[in-house]
Amino acid sequence: MACGLVALEVQGNKMKIIFVRHGEPDYSMLDKLENPQLYSGFGRDLAPLTGKGRSLAKEVAKTVCFGKAEIIISSSVTRALETAHYIAVETGLDLFVEPFFHEWRPDLDGTNSDLTSVLVAHEYYLKHQGALSEDSPYRYETDLEMRHRFLRTLEKYKNYKTIIIVTHGMLMRQFVPDEKIDFCQVIECEIEI
């Protein structure tokens, strides 16, 4: 996997972030339950990786640019944690779990827990370029809120020069220009905090 560099315009100390999107998740065990709706919303975050997702995570763990990193920080969501585990085993780096590096929140009010509602919220999010429209039936997390959540949390790691962050595509897209980010894709960027 190649590590390309993206520069960001944020003020303060320079930090190199090696973003890794989590491996392919396996929601099938949740979907096959007698009451799958019991695992809607954040419940879906309990799903592990598929076999293919594990294989890809083990492969990406050998990425050369990881040798520059000082620590690994992972979203607390299972698919990211499992991916980060393989990177930690391969690199020997300490793994920190960060609950605020989670995926985009399609529901800030706790009202749209079914898949259809999440898809509608996502449609509005895309239609309004990450802003919350007045006509949206759901209050979802905006791009600005995601960026703020991430940067506020990143503050406590500001003494590190290079870190690996295993997280989610929509969060990564707040800081890198890639429209599509594949499972286990590695994107290196530099920011100032």
Regions found by a protein language model. Give the residues of each.
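His/acidic metal-ligating clusters that form di-metal
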Residues: 149-152, 157-158, 165-170
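Acidic, low-complexity terminal tails and accessory targeting/binding regions
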Residues: 10-17, 60-63, 96-118, 159, ...
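Cofactor-binding loop segments of dinucleotide-utilizing enzymes, especially the Rossmann-like FAD-
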Residues: 22, 100, 168
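Active-site-proximal alpha-helix that buttresses catalytic centers in soluble enzyme cores
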Residues: 16-97, 185
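Phosphate-handling substructures
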Residues: 26-30, 34-48, 90-149
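Short, active-site-adjacent cap segments at secondary-structure transitions
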Residues: 26, 80-81, 104, 171-173
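Glycine-rich phosphate-binding loop signature in dinucleotide/nucleotide-binding domains
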Residues: 65-68, 157-161
